[in-house]
Amino acid sequence: MFRASKALGQRFASTNVPVKTARPFRNFLWKLGAATTVFYVGGVALSTYNYQFAELFTDNVPLAEELVQLVESYNDGTLNAPQLSLDEIRKKFGSITRKVQSVPHLGSTSSTVTESQSIASGSGSTAAAATTGTDSNSVVLSSVPPVGSVLLRLPHLKLDDDSNSFNNKSFVESFNKQVDSLNEKEFILPENAVESFLESYHGLSSQLNELNRDLADQLNSQLGQLSAELKQSVESDKVKEIESNKLQLMQQFEKDLSNLKVEFEQKFDSQLQSSLKANEQAMLAKHKNELAMLSIKQVQEFNKIISNKIENERNGRLKNLDELNGSVKTVSDSLAALEETLLRSECVNQLTNLVSSIKFKLNLDNTPSLDISKDLQKLTTLVNILPGKPNKCDAKEPQLIDVVVNELNSLTSAKENKQILSNEQLLNRWGLLQDKIREASLLPPNAGFLGHVSAKFFSLFLFNKSGISNENDIDSVISRVTENIKLNRLDKAVEDVVQLQGWSRLEADDWLQAARSKLELETLVDVVDHEIKTL
């Protein structure tokens, strides 16, 4: 049919001047189809040899799985296409050929070739007509169609919904494109030829639908048979696999059971041995405990007998032993009280003598610097051993004598206070400071070099005073401090020096610290003396 259509199209086209037109869209479709075909053919071919590529190809490419299964079934010989005999093919397509051959030829007016000859000759007559038209260039189309002729319009080929698969769709689309190309050429044929051609065309559509249905039925029957055979083979394989697994499981179960039995026997034997050993140790320990309790009871009975013997002897020959013990305790308490009284009296006497000695040393005038560290150590020892004081751990507040002794030790512990100045030394140092104090009293505030020179010069004209004066000028203060030191009234002297201001106070600062140290020491010694007198 396609050959006849092609020959007929060439006959009709021989009357026209051939014009080559570019069809980029059609070329693109052909290239796309060729590339797609090569891609699918290469993918299917490689999938038959590489299992990993087959999984990747069938999972990501549409229709790849169906094509791979089709090729595998073809290689295995399980695909059986419907076998049609030559008579059946002639019976289905012979009528179409006869109807196409009966179509008359409507070409140029100069052509003398008959319709039957052109169809029978095929491509040869078409080539001759094309050559004639090309060489002579005198072919002229008939401007007026003959009477009884109609325009050839072929409808699109349509298949049933049951036969509408992907391959059939591609074939139908390609065929319909050819039909559209024929319709675009607008062939004019006799009415009876058009009717016979359309009848053959519709017969072709029905024959294709019938062929697709037969092919689908045969494929379904073969698929059902193959699925049944596959199911039967799978079931037989499963039965064999189940039997083998059952046998393996039974063997494994028997093996595990025997191992478990041996393990339980070993565990039971070990537990039995451990329990027997524990019971043996418990029995031995119980036996030892009973022996120990028996020996303890025997010792208790023996002690009881001894205590009874002693009580009997005490009530007999040692009857007055308790009275003697009470008398001895009374005598010992009296002796302890007497010893405490004597010790307290001795400590008080020693403390009194020691304090008197310290006072005597402090009041001496013609002695060098005083060192009373040894006297203070002895004083601390006597205070610590003095009886009658409460215990330091039980007392809530410390005793006054303890606090005073600690202050004395801290006062003399500093390096500069280990040597205490006597009254004679304080008087001599004060005499050396008198000229500096007078000179400093004449200095103006913020005095410079000229101020110091002027103060030095004018201090030569000052008169020295003596005795005790109640005035507050610098000469009266100096004479009053001197007299207080001579009369052993150090507290009054310190009070007058403290009231000095400016450079005079700064010049007398060292002397004031030494005097204060001695004054504090005398005050603490007086407190210790008064505290001793209260004991």
Curated annotation (Swiss-Prot):
<protein>
    <recommendedName>
        <fullName>MICOS complex subunit MIC60</fullName>
    </recommendedName>
</protein>
<keyword id="KW-0809">Transit peptide</keyword>
<keyword id="KW-0175">Coiled coil</keyword>
<keyword id="KW-0496">Mitochondrion</keyword>
<feature type="transit peptide" description="Mitochondrion">
    <location>
        <begin position="1"/>
        <end position="12"/>
    </location>
</feature>
<keyword id="KW-0812">Transmembrane</keyword>
<dbReference type="GO" id="GO:0061617">
    <property type="term" value="C:MICOS complex"/>
</dbReference>
<keyword id="KW-0472">Membrane</keyword>
<keyword id="KW-0999">Mitochondrion inner membrane</keyword>
<feature type="transmembrane region" description="Helical">
    <location>
        <begin position="27"/>
        <end position="49"/>
    </location>
</feature>
<feature type="topological domain" description="Mitochondrial matrix">
    <location>
        <begin position="13"/>
        <end position="26"/>
    </location>
</feature>
<feature type="region of interest" description="Disordered">
    <location>
        <begin position="106"/>
        <end position="136"/>
    </location>
</feature>
<feature type="topological domain" description="Mitochondrial intermembrane">
    <location>
        <begin position="50"/>
        <end position="535"/>
    </location>
</feature>
<dbReference type="GO" id="GO:0042407">
    <property type="term" value="P:cristae formation"/>
</dbReference>
<comment type="similarity">
    <text>Belongs to the MICOS complex subunit Mic60 family.</text>
</comment>
<comment type="function">
    <text>Component of the MICOS complex, a large protein complex of the mitochondrial inner membrane that plays crucial roles in the maintenance of crista junctions, inner membrane architecture, and formation of contact sites to the outer membrane. Plays a role in keeping cristae membranes connected to the inner boundary membrane. Also promotes protein import via the mitochondrial intermembrane space assembly (MIA) pathway.</text>
</comment>
<keyword id="KW-1133">Transmembrane helix</keyword>
<feature type="coiled-coil region">
    <location>
        <begin position="191"/>
        <end position="342"/>
    </location>
</feature>
<dbReference type="InterPro" id="IPR019133">
    <property type="entry name" value="MIC60"/>
</dbReference>
<feature type="compositionally biased region" description="Low complexity">
    <location>
        <begin position="120"/>
        <end position="136"/>
    </location>
</feature>
<comment type="subunit">
    <text>Component of the mitochondrial contact site and cristae organizing system (MICOS) complex.</text>
</comment>
<dbReference type="Pfam" id="PF09731">
    <property type="entry name" value="Mitofilin"/>
</dbReference>
<feature type="compositionally biased region" description="Polar residues">
    <location>
        <begin position="107"/>
        <end position="119"/>
    </location>
</feature>
